[in-house]
Amino acid sequence: MDFSIKACDWTKGSSNGFLTGKSDCIVIGVFESQTLSGAALEIDEATRGLLTRIIKAGDMDGKAGTTLFLHEVSGIGASRVLLVGLGKQDAFNQKAYGDAVRAAWRALLGTKIVQVTFTLAQAPILERTADWGVRAAILALRELTYKFTQMKSKPENAARALKRIVFSVNTGDEKAAKLAAKQGAALANGMDLTRDLGNLPSNVCTPTYLANTAKKLAKDWKLKVEVLGEKQCEALKMGSFLSVTAGSVEPAQFIVLQYQGGAAKAAPVVLVGKGVTFDTGGISLKPGEGMDEMKYDMCGAGSVLGTLRAVAEMGLKLNVVGIIPAVENMPSATATKPGDIVTSMKGLTIEVLNTDAEGRLILCDALTYAERFKPAAVIDIATLTGACIIALGHHNSGLFSKDDALAGELLDASREASDPAWRLPLDDEYQDQLKSNFADLANIGGRPAGSVTAACFLSRFTDAYPWAHLDIAGTAWKSGAAKGATGRPVPLLAQFLIDRAADGRATQ
């Protein structure tokens, strides 16, 4: 799809191309009120009160999510007008805007309309700007049109009529809106990559497949890539990472990608993504019901690849490193057993009390490896704990950090990107739950505060830099009829990096 921006003076709707421009359809928002404003007022005046008459007749009341097509309206250049109910104006926040946008896209996607003039981004969204509305609309459309059918014998490649979307904004918003459109397309492309990787079955998306995907990404976007095999990881004394792959015939891959958009010596942001391409639980075997969804246990890795793709497409002026420890966690005669003790790259010994708490075992060595980049910040992303789902459900990702400034940046980014996260505690008192009689620490801390103790475990390997942990177990994919990867938290991570790139620290 092609996205473009058309700037105009909205106070002169009928004389500057806003209403007279040719297209298949123009999308107009109508608030739940007898008083028209914005684009709706302009179109009402241009049509001698048509909208006023429609509202009085009860055909469109402006209630949230309602839509109405008008055909061949005199005085309007578009062949059709799509009216979209926006609800109450004083409650028109980012959620209400998202609902309205999705209602509009659904109505349009059911037609043969090819080109649309879209005005909803210029509506008065509470605490948001028109450029934010442009980007959000692009992401909503791309989410609605995403389909994963490539594993079917006859993939569904039904061509959609809708090809071109022109966002109509005020002249003063043009520059920001053009940047937002570019960002929206890049984010959508990154999210699609993340979704595709998550939705692939684990017999296709193996650690080697992730490594090959990283290599292709590096070739396409001029990134630097290095893939360490098991012998190289042994030489680096990554005993914790390698303990997880011990039961699998699939070779582990330790993937490192580098994007150089900032100054050569500028400290990078490092993203570490959990890449367990299938998690049976190992010897601590999971129940069979729902185990198919454990192909999504590599969504942290997928989000790192998707974010790097988006960053490269946007050309952000900062340095980013992606680290992906990729393994399968399988039971076999050679698998790590409960009670085994392994030695991490940092030198700390770990008693593996539960082999299904494997994500932290691969992440801890990746976090130690990250030290060599002298990072400005490190963020790990992992489908780490079911406890996080119990705590937060499927709306917020769990955020853990002892660095208030870094946590604040990530929370601000989550709100701006509509990719919410919630900060959870990381108090030192929880560390006591990880004590072991036989090793420096255990890999689990019991049932209480399971997501917190998992983060506490990771924190033991992050003394050298500012660090945050995102537990995306509840947000990386959906179950049930809408089963599939969500592409989260690519928007959050990308927004964090956009904000960092706008800060002088990123290029120094």
UniProtKB/Swiss-Prot annotation:
A Gene Ontology cellular component where this protein is annotated is: cytoplasm
CC cofactor: Mn(2+)
Annotated catalysed reactions: Release of an N-terminal amino acid, Xaa-|-Yaa-, in which Xaa is preferably Leu, but may be other amino acids including Pro although not Arg or Lys, and Yaa may be Pro. Amino acid amides and methyl esters are also readily hydrolyzed, but rates on arylamides are exceedingly low; Release of an N-terminal amino acid, preferentially leucine, but not glutamic or aspartic acids
Cell compartments where the protein resides: Cytoplasm
Please name the GO terms that the record assigns under molecular function: manganese ion binding; metalloaminopeptidase activity
Q: Which InterPro entries match?
A: Leucine_aapep/pepB (IPR011356), Macro_dom-like (IPR043472), Peptidase_M17_C (IPR000819), Peptidase_M17_leu_NH2_pept (IPR023042), Peptidase_M17_N (IPR008283)
Amino-acid positions noted as binding Mn(2+) 1 in the UniProt annotation, renumbered to this chain: D279, D356, E358
The free-text note explaining how the cofactor binds reads: Binds 2 manganese ions per subunit.
Q: Which keywords describe this protein according to UniProt? A: Aminopeptidase, Cytoplasm, Hydrolase, Manganese, Metal-binding, Protease
Q: Name the SUPFAM superfamilies for this protein.
A: Macro domain-like, Zn-dependent exopeptidases
Q: Where does Mn(2+) 2 bind?
A: K274, D279, D297, E358
First-tier enzyme category under EC:
hydrolase
Question: What biological processes does GO assign it?
Answer: proteolysis
Endpoints of the signal sequence: none
Instruction: Tell me which residues this entry annotates as catalytic.
Output: K286, R360
Domain of life, per the record? Bacteria
- The UniProt record lists the EC number as 3.4.11.1, 3.4.11.10
HAMAP family in UniProt: Cytosol_peptidase_M17
Which family is it part of? Belongs to the peptidase M17 family.
* Record function comment: Presumably involved in the processing and regular turnover of intracellular proteins. Catalyzes the removal of unsubstituted N-terminal amino acids from various peptides.
Question: What name appears for this protein in its UniProt entry?
Answer: Probable cytosol aminopeptidase
